[in-house]
Design a protein with these regions (language model features):
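Helix-rich C-terminal "cap"/substrate-channel and partner-interaction subdomain
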Residues: 355-463, 534, 538, 545-546
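An anion/pyrophosphate-binding glycine-rich loop and adjacent beta-alpha core
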Residues: 121, 128-129, 138-166, 170, ...
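N-terminal Rossmann-like FAD-binding beta1-loop-alpha1 element of flavoenzymes
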Residues: 7-33
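Extreme N-terminal leader/targeting segments of oxidoreductases
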Residues: 1-7, 25-28, 510, 514, ...
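Conserved N-terminal glycine-rich FAD pyrophosphate-binding loop of Rossmann-like flavoproteins
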Residues: 37-63, 73
């Protein structure tokens, strides 16, 4: 039996489900989502669910002063020539439209994460006091029945704003948690996926898992469907439009080696991110862009395997910025502003030593002391709590150096210098604490939240702790180039009829930039919306131009 749809979407993360819902609400009667994995949601379901949108409605309602022009100025200040102005405009203009779309078509309601600074807040157009990071309010999964267990990620009945990283205490009262459990309410990335999934099902979107896209079907140079690998064998699915939302290629070692600018040693997103959509687009002559870049992040791995088969890891964005911690390379030396945002730190890990011709900061080691544990806690453990078994503990810095194979004398000298400067509230080596973003994790505990001391404190209270830090990525940022509405372009810059892309599979409109918390999902949501609508609007055309 011939299977045919108006629109086929490959991938079920925020980009894919938004695209499917956009197509269905635009008038497409037959829409299907095919997901490679056995679980829905992709990397979105594993995420915090935060979305970075300049001049967003929740911020405006909270009295935050922001504008389209400020958002564009901010992105331009960070571009380094890698952001195309027309795509930056599409991103900034599309953000509020995405919020409106969710309000009109789903139960998802986005709320401001108050105070969360942009990742480079002192740049022109940046917001040191926050206002661009918004997150879904709790979403009820009641009525989703078996679909609830088919979404990746762990159940989280909390908000980013309730966590220490989001400015909260990290403690939700037991009676509140009980109420949320009874109502089947969830937060973070699963809330975003659950809300989108319910809306897709309501609009009759067909959802199938364990269905991997292999190659695109062409009819006289027009994309006319896709060949799938399914539990029932290979199937040819015909469609007026195909939207690629398959995620990045961080789990494919060959693609990582051939394209990325430096090491990516331990990916943390959905394990199905092996470049399927990229390969499909390459086979039919798609133009590629931004292939060197990823949404970089240092991570600390810990034992265990997630439900989707990926390894457990922590971004440690909070711990790296707290007083009483530093990060050193294999030579026992600091090499960066540890409190900087995780994407920017990718550059520090990719620094090539010209004499050794080696990435000397890979791996790195986070070192902290008992005073940090007592004041702040770490890795999900509250202040004064016992550190997990996978965190190395030693009574002296020399003992810690021996465990990690670091030169003890160099480590001691590094800590001595850092301690002296920290007591004076300065970091002349890497300017840690000078940015509002650096100070955000520790500001709530500081006498002066605007002082660098919010991010600086000596390491001197035994025992000392350490953990290996690898360079990872939340996803890659390179792939087929698109126009501002998600249409995939060929090597000559012309539209490939019938093919669209959204999310991490595409050449990111953000270039090398990570504007603030939620920038990945902003691209996913905005281009999912664009691609889904364009796929319906373009139906019946045999050729297209920008």
């Amino acid at each position: 039996m011939r299977q045919a749809y108006d629109v086929v979407v490959l991938g079920s993360g925020a980009a894919g489900l938004t695209a499917a819902l956009a197509a269905a609400t635009q008038g497409a009667e037959r829409v299907a989502v095919f997901e490679k994995a056995g679980l829905l949601g992709g990397t979105t379901a594993l995420s915090g669910g935060t979305i970075w949108i300049p001049a967003n409605q929740p911020a405006r309602e909270a009295g935050v002063e922001d504008s389209r022009e400020q958002g564009l100025e901010y992105l331009a200040s960070l571009s380094n020539g890698m952001i195309l102005p027309e795509l930056a405009e599409a991103l900034v203009d599309g953000g509020p439209r995405f919020v409106d779309f969710l309000n009109a078509n789903t139960e998802i309601r986005l709320r401001l994460v108050r105070g969360y600074p942009d990742y480079h807040p002192e740049h022109p157009g940046g917001l040191p006091g926050g206002g661009r990071s918004i997150e879904p309010a709790l979403v009820s999964f009641a009525g989703l029945e078996e679909w609830t267990d088919r979404i990746a990620g762990d159940v989280r009945r909390s908000l980013i704003a309730e966590t220490p990283l989001g400015g909260g205490t990290g403690v939700v009262p037991p009676d509140v948690l009980a109420e949320r459990e009874e109502a089947k309410q969830e937060g973070l990335g699963r809330a975003l996926i659950g809300g989108l999934l319910r809306a897709c099902l309501k609009h009759g979107v067909h959802i199938a898992t364990r269905s991997r896209g292999l190659r695109l079907l062409l009819d006289d140079h027009v994309v006319a469907g896709v060949e799938l690998e399914t539990p029932d064998g290979h199937q040819s699915i015909h469609a007026d439009a195909v939207i690629l939302a398959t995620g990045g290629f961080e789990y494919d070692p060959d693609l990582v080696r051939d394209f990325l600018r430096g090491p990516l040693t331990k990916p943390v997103g959905a394990p199905t991110d092996t470049g399927d959509g990229l390969r499909m687009a390459m086979r039919i002559g798609a133009q590629l862009g931004n292939m060197r870049e990823a949404w970089w992040s240092p991570i600390i791995s810990y034992p265990g395997v997630r439900r989707d088969g990926g390894g457990n890891a922590l971004l440690s964005a909070r711990e790296r910025a707290l007083p009483g911690s530093i990060m050193v390379n294999r030579y026992g030396r600091r090499f960066c502003n540890e409190a900087a945002n995780y994407n920017a730190l990718g550059g520090a890990f990719h620094r090539l030593d010209e004499s050794r011709l080696d990435f000397v900061n890979v791996p790195a080691y986070m070192i902290f002391d008992q005073s940090m544990v007592d004041r702040f806690g770490a890795f999900g453990v509250g202040p004064g709590g016992e550190m997990p078994d996978w965190v190395t503990r030693a009574q002296t810095l020399d003992d810690l150096a021996e465990v990690f194979g670091l030169p003890a004398a160099e480590l001691r000298a590094t800590v001595d210098r850092f301690n002296e400067n920290a007591r004076n509230g300065v970091d002349p080596d890497f300017a840690r604490g000078e940015s509002a973003y650096d100070r955000w994790p520790g500001a709530g505990h500081a006498a002066d939240p605007d002082s660098p001391r919010s991010a600086l404190g000596p390491l001197e209270a035994a025992p000392f702790y350490g953990a290996e830090v690898a360079i990872s990525a939340l996803g890659t940022k390179g792939g087929p180039r698109t126009d501002r509405e998600g249409r995939v372009l060929d090597v000559d810059g012309d539209v490939i009829p019938g093919l669209y892309a959204a999310g991490n599979v595409m050449a990111s409109p953000a270039g090398m930039v990570y504007g603030g918390a939620g920038a990945t999902l902003a691209v996913a949501g905005v281009w999912g919306l664009y691609a889904g609508r364009a796929a319906v609007q373009d139906r019946g055309r045999t050729a297209r131009t920008d």
